[in-house]
């Protein structure tokens, strides 16, 4: 009994210790409850949150997963009460954080539950940002991911110097907290700002009539209008009506009091002579933006113009805030939630779930009212966190003040101002930071548009850079730079130079001066640009005409013309050696398997013909002898069958043919077979031996990515690097990680360095560059590079001009005219192919070429081998026959002398072979020798008959063919 008890105790202790050692430091999942309504804003935010949650859970490096669940709360008169009931129902199953995308009374309901139960709440709507109000009614457990806009609007009004504003308030969806706006205005200016408020109609169909009536009332006054509308759908409808209004809007300036000024809206007002300003907080440079955009596009949840709306971006960032908040808690205390999950259920302070009303828990009547035991810890972690672009946020830097509001976030302000002297509105993009205001330099891309008349008296400064064959310095100008012909624009040549000449012919008074720039330009940390884009933004140039690719980052700060050339990223490798042919290349049109089958068919058909000829009575030949007897013979012996079948296969004839039906059927089938085989072989042989192929080690980007033998790289810091870095395509992401991890680095500083590396690495390095440069270099000596595979993407080269430049429309029309006439294609052929230094020659696909000895040497070897074997066989027959003659002569002789008889036989056979024939007179030695030879082998009659028939006329000729 004692030993049994001790054993059980020991087993229990070991079991307890084992359980303690295998406990995971982190919970397997964190329960997140989300609440929204059926409105478009909430649905778009939900799509983004679901995507982000799934993306986080799909990663292998995360210590815990997110158990995300969403509930739709019906709108109505009692929306606040409905929200409270919905939240309380969900909390009964357990939750560790709440997410809310609702505003108004519904938001107040969920905030009340969060505050009462100390449940962390991440809100997708902006807080009031009113310190006084939040000190009295604030929720210490709530953080808002959507930045407040009151401070920004106040700074913008002060920046513009406006003394009066009008506020158009959407009665259905309004988000602007006016008391907070006035509070910020009072702290920023001593000048009073007058404000008037107007309600928009609830029915979207009445927007047009409302605007007309509004204009009749305010036509003679300056109107600075703040539009407070949180619904993207209603806002878009309102903007369309503003854009299409027929009255003069020069005295109007609209400001969108939200962060929904999408590129689609900017394009709509680009040439409308309407003053409008908007704000944007979405960072479009990261891979996360393009991945989310692709997902939302698949689910038809994108905003206007197929862009990610601010609701989707905030939903994405709200999920990141939630995950990083819990990660921060667990990093500080990895055992924080050890008692939270038991038997796969959520427990709070020893009881399952969280109840708003403890009396409703009939399973636990003694349950007290208790808040979430970890709520304060999680709430503090939320408010103390700081994440940014590195963690994948779309709305920039995320950190919160003591009230849960966003702080230190950046906003770009797009200000479109009508210009009566130009076709397009002038555009100014300002940078603003919360707590700081407008940056000291203020301008991310600030430049005014001048009218065309301002340019007529001056030359158009055109920037370009030296990239062959777009722009090059003439060879004679390199050697003798002081020549008169090498001054100014005359020293340049190339595709872009010819394009400028064509544009000058098409555009009136387009007098240009070419200046050399350095690189295209890239965005700096402070928002400014270097390179030719920076020169354009600073006003020191009027246009950039070069191999400048059009991308969204550059499009934000400059205008591009219609593409004058389309290209894409391609792969350059060293041209492989031509395929080497073996001496038996003539056998390669048919596989080894086919050759074996032909040999088996040859033997099999020969056997079949032999058998049917033996069994068919029509193949036997009966001949009467001179003595009255009969001889029965069959021409199709085994050797003759093999010879007949081989001759048919070689398309030759023989002296024997089958006479029976069965033999002819077998022969016809074999002839048909050989006809098809020989015809197919001839066709394949002609194509094979006259087509030179180069076996490229890779043929596509997929081949390049899945191998490691050939390294590959790109030019660092250019548009190609941006393509791989921010691509959402999995294979391009893998290639980018590979290139970043290589030591020594595979990145190069210029195209010239990358091309030289391709040539010097003996086929072990591939360079990814734009197809235009690839194709051009492939036509230049030493002609040892080639392009493989299709282009990875499609991009265009365009002419860059400042925003609203008068030249943009003229350049666009000229480029379209040149495209329609085929002038641009002629220029491309001129500079890429007509001046090529390499023969069209051989490509990867192959091209026709004449036969050479290396391809058909095997045929000559077989011919020579056949001749040698034939001569050896003839020698063997000669010796064999001489030996037989000597043996017979030795047996008939009275005195046996085999050596002498062999010598005589060899001499006789040699004489016949050399002379080619002889006339033997009766009684002569030659006559007797021939008679013996006939008797021995050649004559079919017996020996006696042979001797009786040897008496013939003296002039009978016996040759070696007998």
Swiss-Prot record:
Tissues expressing this chain: Command interneurons of the locomotory control circuit (AIB, AVA, AVB, AVD, AVE and PVC) and motor neurons (RMD, RIM, SMD, AVG, PVQ and URY).
InterPro entries: ANF_lig-bd_rcpt (IPR001828), Glu/Gly-bd (IPR019594), Iono_Glu_rcpt_met (IPR001508), Ionotropic_Glu_rcpt (IPR015683), Iontro_rcpt_C (IPR001320), Peripla_BP_I (IPR028082), Solute-binding_3/MltF_N (IPR001638)
Family: Belongs to the glutamate-gated ion channel (TC 1.A.10.1) family.
TM segment ranges: 592-612, 669-689, 856-876
Subunit structure: Interacts with sol-1. Interacts with cni-1; the interaction negatively regulates export of glr-1 from the endoplasmic reticulum to synapses. Interacts with usp-46; the interaction results in deubiquitination of glr-1.
Name of the protein in its database record: Glutamate receptor 1
General function of this protein: Non-NMDA (N-methyl-D-aspartate) ionotropic glutamate receptor. L-glutamate acts as an excitatory neurotransmitter at many synapses in the central nervous system. The postsynaptic actions of glutamate are mediated by a variety of receptors that are named according to their selective agonists. May contribute to a sensory discrimination between mechanical and chemical stimuli. Plays a role in controlling movement in response to environmental cues such as food availability and mechanosensory stimulation such as the nose touch response.
Gene assigned in the entry: glr-1
Record-level GO BP terms: adult locomotory behavior; associative learning; feeding behavior; forward locomotion; habituation; hyperosmotic response; ionotropic glutamate receptor signaling pathway; modulation of chemical synaptic transmission
Signal peptide: 1-25
Effect seen on changing residue 888 to R: Increased levels of glr-1
